């Protein structure tokens, strides 16, 4: 049985531990470590691409960057990031970037939480 402190941590976790467990079961600790490492490098690049596209008023570039980040976020169970990306992607797909800067701000804040959580998960239990 989980202790209450661990349950509280799980409730506020920025990633879904079930998604990480599925990856661990599918490919072992090495696959999970590799996917986390790739995400921790690629996510900031995707966020920067989204920001650049947004600054250039490039709707298609914004949509593409957010779509890419959405997919990788879902794979690692970062569902708040996934939903924020989805909202921004949908707005861009509809031809509007209204509200997208605020979504990207939120994404950057959420990524900071996810990055810390995934780095800890990678270091603790991915063998």
Question: Can you name each region flagged by the protein language model?
Answer:
Residues 1-64, 68-127:
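Two-component system phosphorelay core
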């Amino acid at each position: 049985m989980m202790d209450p402190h661990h349950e509280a941590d799980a409730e506020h976790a920025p990633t879904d531990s079930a998604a990480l467990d599925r990856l661990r079961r599918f490919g072992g600790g090495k696959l999970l470590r590799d996917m986390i490492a790739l995400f921790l490098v690629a996510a900031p690049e995707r966020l920067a691409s989204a920001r650049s596209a947004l600054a250039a008023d490039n709707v298609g570039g914004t949509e593409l960057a957010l779509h890419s980040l959405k997919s990788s976020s879902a794979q690692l169970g970062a569902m708040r990031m996934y939903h924020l990306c989805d909202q921004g992607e949908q707005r861009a797909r509809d031809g509007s970037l209204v509200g997208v800067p605020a979504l990207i701000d939120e994404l950057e804040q959420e990524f900071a939480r996810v990055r810390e959580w995934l780095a800890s998960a990678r270091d603790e239990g991915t063998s």
